[in-house]
């Protein structure tokens, strides 16, 4: 049986999904919230915090020791204070929402005189303040300086070791040069690379390259050790006659050409010149061939593997790695050498690269090698042994400067084929040798290079990790200053507080949150854009890629993106592919790699057991698609199944499948999963569709989509714009700005308040100037459960995301007005305010302290008519509710003017009338051009120490009254609850003492009615246990009263204190204007399928094409916009939308005709459960009252959900719905011309489509100017709307006039109409005087030209006759 929540049962969305939901959509913001919680560990006790986030940052820096190591500052733990203001207050005051961080430290001082380290004293610290740490709001944002910001997660290259090649680009020969790179989380990069001559080099931090053997030698390896580690050996025996025998190991020769006859038992097994195949090798092993006589040519040219030493004299005959010649072999015979070893080097997987490199290496000792590295890192400085050693040790072997991190070590060990995933954060000798070995193996053809775009090699760095890095930088800066001060700590008796300077830590954190590239101004256009912004993954930013350098491969969709990053949603333009969106079900694992859920398949049966796999693990398994056909037991019905294995799509037998996708929408992001019939749209248009949904402006009346995907509710619930019940209960009271809930008894903690008050956000400005407004959905007496929706926010309708409006659309041309994607709309759409939006503009007026005196905000403004001041109050600030237009004064402000010498008459007037108009000028805040609206809010901020004006006091009183009202309601409900419990306790009890009653009487209702509830607590019963309970209740009531009173006083004190304003600012007034914008020509609109266009004309309703029943269409779109764009989803949406509205219309008709409830239930059951394969809706679970309410809400249309890749089928669903709605199954009908009444020739596709109005409004773009500002240098008009610019007659326009020889026009354009300053003022004068003469002068641009030529050192001047 289906259970519906309070809001779900009011409007049930019919779902066409044929597959059961195995895994609910996870909380969409969990990545941000979990990451930051891990960083703070705010609610974890100090002793039990894990080593991550802040804790790890502190532990990595502390203890800080003095230079002589006799004093050390140790870290004990940290805790957070209470934030000074809550989120809303921070937004209003323009401050950061943060909590003070306090750290407990201890100072340990050791005894200098004792030989062993002996503690002399310990200075325990009370907590030390370490700056404010911004807190995350419940919705995953930060409030920084009053504005909401989001920290976008970064996709960066995982630390570890990577093997690659240059793809033949590095050298003109086109030879592939292999390389390896060890990337730490923190520290120097180490690159190993081959050059064209097959020598191996290394680079540290991309500097000059050195031979790899220098690095190996600096690690302490000798020549002999290097050869032993990297090469196999061949042993040769010499007899006195000079015959050479090879100790034969057949495996060493596999795949080579035999350079001599290989003989066994007197027969030739492999003749010279034949390839030694694996068959021959097997034969030789079977025959146990142990030695072969080889010709001298075979040995000549080989390299000695070990030093050859004369055993008698101890003299070195030949050093290892020397080439053997015939002369040397003869000498060996003479010296009686019986045996020598050579390096096994051949073309067949045993390259001699390292030996070649070693021969070029001129260093011989470890010290020389380290000195060479020192010279490379610090050119120009003479290397000493100490300096060289300390630099080399610090590069890769010092934990303070080098850290591979847990991820890096895991990736490193995996890459080298080691079993364990844990290990040290620094490199070891074995690590570097292992990397060189693998690089040589790859060069020899064993093993492959890494794909750096594979999501197993890129990881997510979330908010918490980035904040930790910023904090660590601050701590490192702090460490330097502490180290210097520690020496004085003992002698001067300093405490930890004296040692620590908070500034560097606070500055580092503040810099990260306010100016990092990844700390972005939140996109608050609508709820979807907020959610998407928090789920965005960027490859840009510090330590990431740059737009210019990123190539095509990085931006492209990779097979590992499946279920992790959305292949559709990414911006168009220079950032394409660099900014991605998290897929619906994706999450990060402990190492920061993205993982996606799969259902486990056991013995060919799909189970409901969910396992998350990262890209590293996924390639090992065979994974079936979510649309594979299963029987009722979960077994695959088809023999061959479409699967993914090793990043390839293949068909596999069902017995080999190990996992199966969780859901068809697994691969897309939240925005793409909101597009119905996405599977029928071309990818490019789907990309535009998902991006444009984020630009939809919340309309005045939100309208749920008739055709959705079922994700609308999930997005709205997780976005944070709705008000959800924290605890279940009964609605006590509701008005437009707050909801009071009396909480269920079983959800109230002992002694807790049984009341929740939700203050709604009313007409508040968002970051994008759209309007945030919440409207209640509940009525007094409603019963709600935890998590139910109490109030809708912007762009939500009954708890579902509603970005646009359902409008009746026809696809047909109409007089060329829908040419090139133009959109023709009916006047009705505009009249009914379907796409009317409210925008809130913030205008600020600042009164500063100037040199000539303070600026003043007042209504006493010089030279201003009375009528202009009509909308201002006595303090000079506009009233809330005033309707203002361009040029109106919002805040009256006067600024002192410089004193000028006054004439005797002025002095006399001033002496008589005290006239002060002359020494101040009007600098009021006025409504800017092209704006008109209603004042919805005014905020006054006053500096501390300056008296607040009347308006500021009135605003303060309003805020305090609102808090008082909340507290009064909380007390009322709490008291009523306690009194109710007291009454139940007292009734029927034997009295010991009570007014007007004798001892022994029982308490009855009459007694309770005669006395006040406060008196009940003074009654005494004969049962002492009851008296104790009464006393406890009385105490609880008093405690709660005091607690709420204290809270009220605290809030009151906050409001009455002054504001923290910028230096020199005395007062600041912010005025908020609500601007109503109707849909008009020039506005951009779009559907959800990337079908965008601009409104071209608003046509009267009577002229619009209409249907046979007389219904005029709302919008006419061009049919030519569909075939070439290949977004057929919009046509299917049109048909299903028509069916949905038609079904609603039929239901409304039945209700109006008074059909019995049984018939309505039967009809709706036929609609909701028409296809047994689809999700079943249990309408019988609804009571009659709930059912009637559902019917009333479905009159406008029955909302449908067609989930992506699992939606409505054309024949069995779409046509069935159209038939049920009694509409043509083709989805087309005849239309009539509204102007002539004639029928159009052929049928037209008509239906309901969900259209959005985008944030590109014509009002923000259109702009006109007569006169305005000019550029100072050229005296030509400025450009652009923001500067109130105009048209400039530029060089190309001049060429056009020159081409026509229009010399007089040209002269006029270049002089009096443009930048001839004197000429244009004279011309104005002449026009006023009626004298129509032009006197052209010298254009200012000419002066600019002469100045520029003079700057080149050429003296140029204009001689005038």
Swiss-Prot record:
Protein origin, superkingdom: Bacteria
One Pfam family of this chain: RNA_pol_Rpb2_1
Single GO molecular function: DNA binding
Alphabetical GO biological process terms: DNA-templated transcription
Entry keywords, A to Z: DNA-directed RNA polymerase, Nucleotidyltransferase, Transcription, Transferase
Its EC number(s): 2.7.7.6
HAMAP family attached to this UniProt entry: RNApol_bact_RpoB
Subunit structure: The RNAP catalytic core consists of 2 alpha, 1 beta, 1 beta' and 1 omega subunit. When a sigma factor is associated with the core the holoenzyme is formed, which can initiate transcription.
Protein name, as recorded: DNA-directed RNA polymerase subunit beta
């Amino acid at each position: 049986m289906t259970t519906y929540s309070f809001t779900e049962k009011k409007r049930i969305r019919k779902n066409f999904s044929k597959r059961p939901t195995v895994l609910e959509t996870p909380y969409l913001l969990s990545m941000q919230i979990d990451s930051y919680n891990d960083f703070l560990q705010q609610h974890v006790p100090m002793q039990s915090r894990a080593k991550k986030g802040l804790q790890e940052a502190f532990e990595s820096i502390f203890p800080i020791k003095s230079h002589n190591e006799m004093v050390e500052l140790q870290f004990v733990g940290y805790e957070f204070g209470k934030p000074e203001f809550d989120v809303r207050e921070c937004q209003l005051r323009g401050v950061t929402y943060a909590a003070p961080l306090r750290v407990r430290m201890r100072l340990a001082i050791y005894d200098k005189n004792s030989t062993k380290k002996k503690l002399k004293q310990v200075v325990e610290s009370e907590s030390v303040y370490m700056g404010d740490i911004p807190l995350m709001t419940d919705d995953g944002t930060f409030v920084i300086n009053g504005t909401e910001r989001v920290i976008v997660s970064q996709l960066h290259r995982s630390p570890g070791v990577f093997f690659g090649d240059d793809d033949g680009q590095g050298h003109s020969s086109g030879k592939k040069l292999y390389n390896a790179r060890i990337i730490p989380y923190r520290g120097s990069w180490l690159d190993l690379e081959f050059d064209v001559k097959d020598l191996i080099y290394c680079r540290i931090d991309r500097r000059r390259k050195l031979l790899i053997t220098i690095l190996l030698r600096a690690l302490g390896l000798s020549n002999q050790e290097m050869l032993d580690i990297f090469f196999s050996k061949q042993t040769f025996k010499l007899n006195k006659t000079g015959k050479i025998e090879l100790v034969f190991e057949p495996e060493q020769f596999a795949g080579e050409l035999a350079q001599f006859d290989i003989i066994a038992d007197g027969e030739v097994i492999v003749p010279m010149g034949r390839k030694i195949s694996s068959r021959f090798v097997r034969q030789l092993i079977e025959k146990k061939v142990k030695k072969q006589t080889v010709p001298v040519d075979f040995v000549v040219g080989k390299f000695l593997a070990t030093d050859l030493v004369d055993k008698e004299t101890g003299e070195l005959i030949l050093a290892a790695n020397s080439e053997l010649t015939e002369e040397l072999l003869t000498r060996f015979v003479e010296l009686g050498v019986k045996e020598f070893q050579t390096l096994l080097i051949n073309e067949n997987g045993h390259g001699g690269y390292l030996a070649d490199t070693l021969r070029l290496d001129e260093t011989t000792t470890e010290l020389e090698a380290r000195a060479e590295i020192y010279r490379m890192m610090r050119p120009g400085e003479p290397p000493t042994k100490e300096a060289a050693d300390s630099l080399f040790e610090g590069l890769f072997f010092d934990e303070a400067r080098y850290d591979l991190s847990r991820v890096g070590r895991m990736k490193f060990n995996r890459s080298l084929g080691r079993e364990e995933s844990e290990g040290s954060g620094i490199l070891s000798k074995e690590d570097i040798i292992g990397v060189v070995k693998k690089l040589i193996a790859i060069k020899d053809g064993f093993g492959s290079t890494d794909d750096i775009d594979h999501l197993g090699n890129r990881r997510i760095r979330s908010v918490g990790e980035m904040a930790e890095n910023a904090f660590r930088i601050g701590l490192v800066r702090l460490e330097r200053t502490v180290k210097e001060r520690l020496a004085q700590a003992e002698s001067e008796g300093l405490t930890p507080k004296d040692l620590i300077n908070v500034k560097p830590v606070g500055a580092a954190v503040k810099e990260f949150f306010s100016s990092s590239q990844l700390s972005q101004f939140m996109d608050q256009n609508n709820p979807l854009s907020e959610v998407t912004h928090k789920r965005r993954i960027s490859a840009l930013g510090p330590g990431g890629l740059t737009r210019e350098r990123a190539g095509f491969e990085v931006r492209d969709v990779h097979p590992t993106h499946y279920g992790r990053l959305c292949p559709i949603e990414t911006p168009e333009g220079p950032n394409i592919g660099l900014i991605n969106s998290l897929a619906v079900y994706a999450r990060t694992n402990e190492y920061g790699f993205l993982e996606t859920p799969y259902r486990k398949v056991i013995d060919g049966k799909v189970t409901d057991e969910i396992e998350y796999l990262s890209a590293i693990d996924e390639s090992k398994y065979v994974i079936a698609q979510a649309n594979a056909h299963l029987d009722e037991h979960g077994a695959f019905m088809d023999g061959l199944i479409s699967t993914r294995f090793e990043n390839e799509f293949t068909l596999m037998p069902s017995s080999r499948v190990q996992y199966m996708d969780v859901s068809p929408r697994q691969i897309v992001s939240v925005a793409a999963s909101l597009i119905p019939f996405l599977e029928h749209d071309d990818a490019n248009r789907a990309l535009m569709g998902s991006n444009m949904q984020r630009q939809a402006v919340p309309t005045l009346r939100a309208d749920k989509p008739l055709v959705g995907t079922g994700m609308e509710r999930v997005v709205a619930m997780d976005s944070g714009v709705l008000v959800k019940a924290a605890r279940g209960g009964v609605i006590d009271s509701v008005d437009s700005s707050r909801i009071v809930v009396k909480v269920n008894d079983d959800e109230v903690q002992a002694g807790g308040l049984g009341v929740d008050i939700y203050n709604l956000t009313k007409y508040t400005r968002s970051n994008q100037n759209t309007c945030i407004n919440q409207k209640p959905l509940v009525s007094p007496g409603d019963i709600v459960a935890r998590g139910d929706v109490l109030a809708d926010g912007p762009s939500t309708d009954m708890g579902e995301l509603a970005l646009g409006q359902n409008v009746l659309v026809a696809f047909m041309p109409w007089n060329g007005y829908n040419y090139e994607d133009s959109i023709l709309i009916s006047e009705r759409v505009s009249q009914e305010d379907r796409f009317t939006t409210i925008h809130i503009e913030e205008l600020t007026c600042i009164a500063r302290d100037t040199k000539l005196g303070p600026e003043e905000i007042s209504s006493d403004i010089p030279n201003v008519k009375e009528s202009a001041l009509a909308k201002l109050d006595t303090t000079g600030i506009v009233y809330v509710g005033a309707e203002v237009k361009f040029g109106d004064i919002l805040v009256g402000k006067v600024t002192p003017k410089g004193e000028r010498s006054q004439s005797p008459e002025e002095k006399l007037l001033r002496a008589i009338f005290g006239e002060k108009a002359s020494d101040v000028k009007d600098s009021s805040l006025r409504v800017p051009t092209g704006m008109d609206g209603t004042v919805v809010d005014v905020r006054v901020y006053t500096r501390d120490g300056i008296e607040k004006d009347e308006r500021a006091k009135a605003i303060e009183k309003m805020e305090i009254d609102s808090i008082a009202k909340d507290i009064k309601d909380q007390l009322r409900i709490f008291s009523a609850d306690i009194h109710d419990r007291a009454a139940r306790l007292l009734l029927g009890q034997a009295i010991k003492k009570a007014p007007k009653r004798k001892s022994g009487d029982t308490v009855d209702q009459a007694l309770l009615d005669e006395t006040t509830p406060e008196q009940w607590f003074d009654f005494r019963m004969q049962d002492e246990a009851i008296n104790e309970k009464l006393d406890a209740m009385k105490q609880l009531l008093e405690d709660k009263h005091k607690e709420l009173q204290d809270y009220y006083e605290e809030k009151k004190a906050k409001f009455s204190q002054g504001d923290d304003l910028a230096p020199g600012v005395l007062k600041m007034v912010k005025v908020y204007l609500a601007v109503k914008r109707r849909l008009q020509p020039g506005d951009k609109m779009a559907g959800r399928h990337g079908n965008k266009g601009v409104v071209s004309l608003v046509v009267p309703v009577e002229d619009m094409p209409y249907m046979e029943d007389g219904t005029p269409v709302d919008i006419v779109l061009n049919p030519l916009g569909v075939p070439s764009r290949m977004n057929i989803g919009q046509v299917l949406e049109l048909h299903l939308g028509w069916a949905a509205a038609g079904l609603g219309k039929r239901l409304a008709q039945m209700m109006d005709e008074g059909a019995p409830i049984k018939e309505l239930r039967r009809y709706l059951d036929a609609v909701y459960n028409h296809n047994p394969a689809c999700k079943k809706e249990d309408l019988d679970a609804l009571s009659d009252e709930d059912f009637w309410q559902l019917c009333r809400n479905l009159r406008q249309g029955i909302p449908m959900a067609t989930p992506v890749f699992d939606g409505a089928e054309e024949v069995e669903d779409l046509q069935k719905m159209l038939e049920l709605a009694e509409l043509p199954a083709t989805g087309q009908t005849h239309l009539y011309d509204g102007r002539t009444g004639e029928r159009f020739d052929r049928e037209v596709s008509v239906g309901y489509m969900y259209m959005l109005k985008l944030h590109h409004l014509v009002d923000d773009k259109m702009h006109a100017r007569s006169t305005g500002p000019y550029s100072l240098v050229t005296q030509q008009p400025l450009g652009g709307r923001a500067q109130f610019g105009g048209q400039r007659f530029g060089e190309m326009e001049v060429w056009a006039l020159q081409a026509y020889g229009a010399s007089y026009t040209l002269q006029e354009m270049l002089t009096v109409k443009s930048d001839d300053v004197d000429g244009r003022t004279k011309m104005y004068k002449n026009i006023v005087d009626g004298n129509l003469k032009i006197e052209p002068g010298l254009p200012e641009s000419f002066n600019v030209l002469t100045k520029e030529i003079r700057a080149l050192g050429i003296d140029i001047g204009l001689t005038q006759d």
